[in-house]
Protein backbone atom coordinates (compact mmCIF):
# COMPACT_ATOMS: atom_id res chain seq x y z
CA UNK A 1 0.00 0.00 0.00
CA UNK A 2 1.20 3.51 -0.85
CA UNK A 3 1.23 5.27 2.50
CA UNK A 4 1.99 8.66 0.93
CA UNK A 5 -1.19 8.55 -1.16
CA UNK A 6 -3.25 7.30 1.79
CA UNK A 7 -1.98 10.21 3.89
CA UNK A 8 -2.77 12.61 1.04
CA UNK A 9 -6.36 11.40 0.79
CA UNK A 10 -6.77 11.43 4.55
CA UNK A 11 -5.43 14.97 4.88
CA UNK A 12 -7.89 16.32 2.29
CA UNK A 13 -10.86 14.12 3.15
CA UNK A 14 -14.40 15.47 3.10
CA UNK A 15 -17.58 13.59 2.14
CA UNK A 16 -18.51 14.21 -1.49
CA UNK A 17 -15.13 15.41 -2.70
CA UNK A 18 -13.94 14.09 -6.06
CA UNK A 19 -10.79 12.00 -6.28
CA UNK A 20 -8.74 11.34 -9.41
CA UNK A 21 -5.93 8.80 -9.73
CA UNK A 22 -3.40 7.98 -12.41
CA UNK A 23 -1.65 4.62 -12.41
CA UNK A 24 1.36 3.34 -14.34
CA UNK A 25 -0.41 0.01 -14.82
CA UNK A 26 -0.33 -0.75 -18.60
CA UNK A 27 -4.13 -0.95 -18.90
CA UNK A 28 -4.64 2.29 -17.00
CA UNK A 29 -1.90 3.99 -19.03
CA UNK A 30 -3.86 3.18 -22.19
CA UNK A 31 -6.84 5.04 -20.73
CA UNK A 32 -4.60 7.98 -19.90
CA UNK A 33 -3.08 7.99 -23.38
CA UNK A 34 -6.55 7.82 -24.93
CA UNK A 35 -7.33 11.21 -23.38
CA UNK A 36 -4.29 12.93 -24.94
CA UNK A 37 -6.41 15.06 -27.29
CA UNK A 38 -8.13 16.58 -24.26
CA UNK A 39 -5.01 17.70 -22.38
CA UNK A 40 -3.61 21.20 -22.77
CA UNK A 41 -0.17 19.98 -23.87
CA UNK A 42 -1.23 16.95 -25.92
CA UNK A 43 0.47 14.57 -23.51
CA UNK A 44 -1.35 11.63 -21.90
CA UNK A 45 -3.76 12.57 -19.14
CA UNK A 46 -2.53 12.24 -15.60
CA UNK A 47 -5.70 10.39 -14.62
CA UNK A 48 -7.44 7.14 -15.48
CA UNK A 49 -10.09 6.89 -12.75
CA UNK A 50 -12.50 9.11 -10.81
CA UNK A 51 -14.49 8.45 -7.64
CA UNK A 52 -16.29 10.17 -4.78
CA UNK A 53 -15.27 10.26 -1.14
CA UNK A 54 -17.88 8.74 1.14
CA UNK A 55 -17.81 8.27 4.89
CA UNK A 56 -15.09 7.68 7.44
CA UNK A 57 -16.08 4.68 9.57
CA UNK A 58 -14.71 3.26 12.76
CA UNK A 59 -14.26 -0.25 11.40
CA UNK A 60 -11.28 -1.19 13.56
CA UNK A 61 -8.69 -0.74 10.82
CA UNK A 62 -5.62 1.42 11.30
CA UNK A 63 -5.57 2.91 7.79
CA UNK A 64 -8.07 5.72 8.28
CA UNK A 65 -11.15 3.70 7.31
CA UNK A 66 -12.14 5.97 4.40
CA UNK A 67 -14.83 4.69 2.05
CA UNK A 68 -15.52 5.76 -1.52
CA UNK A 69 -18.19 5.43 -4.20
CA UNK A 70 -17.11 4.44 -7.70
CA UNK A 71 -18.02 2.64 -10.90
CA UNK A 72 -15.37 0.07 -11.70
CA UNK A 73 -14.64 -3.37 -13.08
CA UNK A 74 -12.44 -5.20 -10.60
CA UNK A 75 -11.22 -8.75 -11.25
CA UNK A 76 -9.26 -10.64 -8.60
CA UNK A 77 -7.72 -13.87 -9.83
CA UNK A 78 -6.37 -14.75 -6.40
CA UNK A 79 -9.81 -14.40 -4.79
CA UNK A 80 -11.78 -15.73 -7.78
CA UNK A 81 -13.91 -12.62 -7.58
CA UNK A 82 -15.38 -10.18 -10.10
CA UNK A 83 -16.93 -6.87 -9.02
CA UNK A 84 -18.65 -4.95 -11.77
CA UNK A 85 -20.48 -1.64 -11.53
CA UNK A 86 -21.20 1.12 -9.05
CA UNK A 87 -19.91 0.05 -5.66
CA UNK A 88 -18.69 1.19 -2.28
CA UNK A 89 -15.00 0.47 -1.70
CA UNK A 90 -12.28 1.34 0.77
CA UNK A 91 -9.98 4.10 -0.42
CA UNK A 92 -6.96 1.87 0.16
CA UNK A 93 -7.98 0.07 -3.04
CA UNK A 94 -6.50 3.01 -4.97
CA UNK A 95 -3.48 3.66 -2.75
CA UNK A 96 -1.32 1.72 -5.18
CA UNK A 97 2.45 1.54 -5.32
CA UNK A 98 2.35 2.21 -9.07
CA UNK A 99 0.25 5.37 -8.67
CA UNK A 100 1.86 8.40 -10.32
CA UNK A 101 -0.76 11.09 -9.75
CA UNK A 102 -3.69 11.80 -7.47
CA UNK A 103 -6.00 14.76 -6.91
CA UNK A 104 -8.80 15.80 -4.57
CA UNK A 105 -11.34 18.32 -5.88
CA UNK A 106 -14.27 19.94 -4.12
CA UNK A 107 -17.10 22.42 -4.52
CA UNK A 108 -18.20 24.96 -1.95
CA UNK A 109 -21.25 22.91 -0.98
CA UNK A 110 -23.49 23.49 2.01
CA UNK A 111 -23.80 20.69 4.56
CA UNK A 112 -27.24 19.90 3.16
CA UNK A 113 -25.86 19.66 -0.39
CA UNK A 114 -22.93 17.51 0.73
CA UNK A 115 -25.28 15.13 2.54
CA UNK A 116 -27.54 14.98 -0.52
CA UNK A 117 -24.55 14.19 -2.76
CA UNK A 118 -23.48 11.25 -0.61
CA UNK A 119 -27.09 10.11 -0.42
CA UNK A 120 -27.33 10.18 -4.22
CA UNK A 121 -24.14 8.11 -4.50
CA UNK A 122 -25.58 5.62 -2.01
CA UNK A 123 -28.80 5.44 -4.03
CA UNK A 124 -26.89 4.56 -7.20
CA UNK A 125 -24.65 2.11 -5.34
CA UNK A 126 -27.48 0.08 -3.89
CA UNK A 127 -30.00 0.53 -6.71
CA UNK A 128 -31.89 -2.73 -7.23
CA UNK A 129 -31.08 -2.66 -10.96
CA UNK A 130 -27.36 -2.71 -10.07
CA UNK A 131 -25.66 -0.19 -12.35
CA UNK A 132 -22.73 -1.87 -14.10
CA UNK A 133 -19.39 -0.64 -15.49
CA UNK A 134 -19.61 -0.60 -19.32
CA UNK A 135 -16.33 -1.57 -20.99
CA UNK A 136 -17.89 -0.86 -24.38
CA UNK A 137 -18.80 2.67 -23.32
CA UNK A 138 -15.16 3.29 -22.42
CA UNK A 139 -14.19 2.54 -26.02
CA UNK A 140 -17.13 4.67 -27.16
CA UNK A 141 -15.70 7.66 -25.32
CA UNK A 142 -12.23 7.08 -26.77
CA UNK A 143 -13.86 6.98 -30.21
CA UNK A 144 -15.72 10.22 -29.45
CA UNK A 145 -12.45 11.90 -28.44
CA UNK A 146 -10.76 10.91 -31.71
CA UNK A 147 -13.75 11.84 -33.87
CA UNK A 148 -14.62 15.05 -32.03
CA UNK A 149 -18.04 13.75 -30.97
CA UNK A 150 -17.92 14.21 -27.21
CA UNK A 151 -21.10 16.28 -27.37
CA UNK A 152 -23.00 13.32 -28.84
CA UNK A 153 -24.41 10.44 -26.83
CA UNK A 154 -21.91 7.59 -26.44
CA UNK A 155 -22.34 5.17 -29.35
CA UNK A 156 -22.08 2.23 -26.93
CA UNK A 157 -24.27 3.72 -24.20
CA UNK A 158 -26.04 1.02 -22.19
CA UNK A 159 -28.99 1.42 -19.85
CA UNK A 160 -28.01 0.80 -16.21
CA UNK A 161 -24.28 1.06 -16.96
CA UNK A 162 -21.94 4.03 -16.36
CA UNK A 163 -18.23 4.77 -16.54
CA UNK A 164 -16.37 6.09 -13.50
CA UNK A 165 -16.35 9.77 -14.50
CA UNK A 166 -19.94 9.59 -15.75
CA UNK A 167 -21.00 8.22 -12.35
CA UNK A 168 -19.30 11.08 -10.51
CA UNK A 169 -20.92 13.65 -12.79
CA UNK A 170 -24.36 12.04 -12.44
CA UNK A 171 -24.15 12.28 -8.66
CA UNK A 172 -23.55 16.03 -8.87
CA UNK A 173 -26.27 16.45 -11.49
CA UNK A 174 -28.59 14.67 -9.08
CA UNK A 175 -28.25 17.54 -6.58
CA UNK A 176 -28.56 20.28 -9.19
CA UNK A 177 -24.87 20.84 -9.99
CA UNK A 178 -22.96 19.95 -13.16
CA UNK A 179 -19.19 19.76 -12.75
CA UNK A 180 -18.58 19.92 -16.52
CA UNK A 181 -19.12 23.29 -18.19
CA UNK A 182 -18.56 22.15 -21.79
CA UNK A 183 -21.08 20.53 -24.13
CA UNK A 184 -19.67 17.05 -23.47
CA UNK A 185 -22.49 14.53 -23.16
CA UNK A 186 -22.74 12.94 -19.73
CA UNK A 187 -22.04 9.49 -21.22
CA UNK A 188 -18.67 10.71 -22.53
CA UNK A 189 -17.38 12.32 -19.33
CA UNK A 190 -13.67 11.68 -18.70
CA UNK A 191 -11.34 12.00 -15.71
CA UNK A 192 -9.29 14.51 -17.71
CA UNK A 193 -12.22 16.84 -18.29
CA UNK A 194 -13.13 16.64 -14.61
CA UNK A 195 -9.54 17.56 -13.72
CA UNK A 196 -9.72 20.68 -15.91
CA UNK A 197 -13.14 21.83 -14.73
CA UNK A 198 -13.11 25.40 -13.38
CA UNK A 199 -16.09 24.83 -11.08
CA UNK A 200 -14.03 23.33 -8.27
CA UNK A 201 -13.15 25.71 -5.45
CA UNK A 202 -10.90 23.19 -3.67
CA UNK A 203 -8.01 21.49 -5.44
CA UNK A 204 -5.06 19.52 -4.09
CA UNK A 205 -2.71 17.39 -6.19
CA UNK A 206 -0.15 14.70 -5.46
CA UNK A 207 2.67 13.57 -7.75
CA UNK A 208 5.02 10.65 -7.28
CA UNK A 209 8.55 11.85 -6.66
What label would you give each PLM region?
Residues 1-209:
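Cysteine-nucleophile amide-bond enzymes
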Amino acid sequence: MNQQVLNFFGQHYAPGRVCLVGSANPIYKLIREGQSKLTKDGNPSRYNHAFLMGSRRNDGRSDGSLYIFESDLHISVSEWQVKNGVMESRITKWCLDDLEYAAVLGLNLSQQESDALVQKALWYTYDENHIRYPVGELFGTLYAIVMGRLNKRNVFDIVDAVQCATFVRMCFQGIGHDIIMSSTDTTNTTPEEISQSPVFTFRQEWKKE
